[in-house]
C-alpha cells in the first residue's frame, strides 16, 4: 500500500518528517496532517505533564500594514485591538453581519500600523478574501504570508525549559499572549509567542518554511526536550487537549450558524468599541433578552461517549440540542462533551441525556473549562 499523500492535499514543509516518524496522516481541511504518532493518549499526557511538539504550519497568517490597519482590524474583528500594546496578542473573531462566525482568530500587534491575524487552516482562503475585501475602505495593505512560515507549537509545563535551550531570549519576560522576536536555533528575527491551543503553558514559533530549516529546527526542539519526555504530537491530541480546556473549534462550537452569545464568547466581543461587522445584530440579541440556546459542558454519568452531532434529550426524551464535540478526556479520565441546549436548560448540575446508538445515556451539565492548568507555585 502506498504511503504517499494524495496529490490534491496540501503539505507542510515537515510532511516527509512526519511520515518518517510513522505518523498516521489524515486529510484535515485539505491538508495532509499527522493525527497521531505514538498514540493520542501518550501525546495528550505528554503535553499535560511534560512537553509536546506540534506542526501547526497549516494555520494562516494575514498581515495588515499602514495607517489604517488598526481601523481595519477594529472593523473586521470583534475584540478591541486599540487596547493591545506592541508585543501583545489577543483572542478575537471575525463575524458575518448577522453576528455569526466567519472564523476565530488571534490578533498580534507588531506596531501601531502593523497587525498580524492568525486564522484557521480550513478557512484560510475564505478568511483571506474576507479580510482583504473588508479592509479595502481603510488605508492599509493586506498580505497573505501563510505559506512563508513553518509554525511550531511547543506546549506543556516544560515548554519554557525546552525552548530556553535553543534561544537567549528571556522567555520569563514573555507573559501569556505576549510575543517578541529573537534568535531561535540560530535563526534571527524569529517570532516567539506565548500562545497555544492546549490549555497549557507554551510557545508558538514562526520560522522560514523551507524543508531543510523546518526539519533542523524540529529535530533540535525534540533533542532539547528529550530530558522532559517530549514527543511529537498530532491533531488528535490537539483536539482532546483543546476539548478538555473547552476551546472552540470552527465547524463545531462556532460556525456561520452560531452567534457570539450562543457560543459564550461574548467576553471577547466589545460592543462598546464602536460599530464593526456583526455588532448591530449582536446588539439586537441583547435587546431581545439574550440567546435562545447556549453552549454547555457535559460530563457523562452513564457509560458512553458523546460524539459530534449526537442529539441531546431532555428528561422526557425529547431532542432539545446537539453535541458539538465529545471524547474521552485522557487526563481527566472522564467522558466529556460540549453541546448546545436551550438557554432555559443550560443550568449547572442539570441532568440531560445524550442519544448514543438510539439509547438515551445520562449526562450532567458541568462548569467549563473541564480542565485548568495548575497555577505555578511561588
UniProtKB/Swiss-Prot annotation:
GO BP: glycine decarboxylation via glycine cleavage system
Reported function: The glycine cleavage system catalyzes the degradation of glycine.
E.C. numbers: 2.1.2.10
GO MF term list: aminomethyltransferase activity; transaminase activity
Family the UniProt entry places it in: Belongs to the GcvT family.
InterPro entries: GCS_T, GCS_T_bac, GCST_C, GCV_T_N, GcvT/YgfZ/DmdA, GcvT/YgfZ_C, TrmE/GcvT_dom1
Alphabetic keyword roster: Aminotransferase, Transferase
An annotated GO cellular component: glycine cleavage complex
Cystine crosslinks: none
Catalytic activity: N(6)-[(R)-S(8)-aminomethyldihydrolipoyl]-L-lysyl-[protein] + (6S)-5,6,7,8-tetrahydrofolate = N(6)-[(R)-dihydrolipoyl]-L-lysyl-[protein] + (6R)-5,10-methylene-5,6,7,8-tetrahydrofolate + NH4(+)
Protein name listed in UniProt: Aminomethyltransferase
UniProt keyword Cell division present: no
Keyword Transferase appears in the UniProt entry: yes
The protein's assembly and partners: The glycine cleavage system is composed of four proteins: P, T, L and H.
Domain of life according to the entry: Bacteria
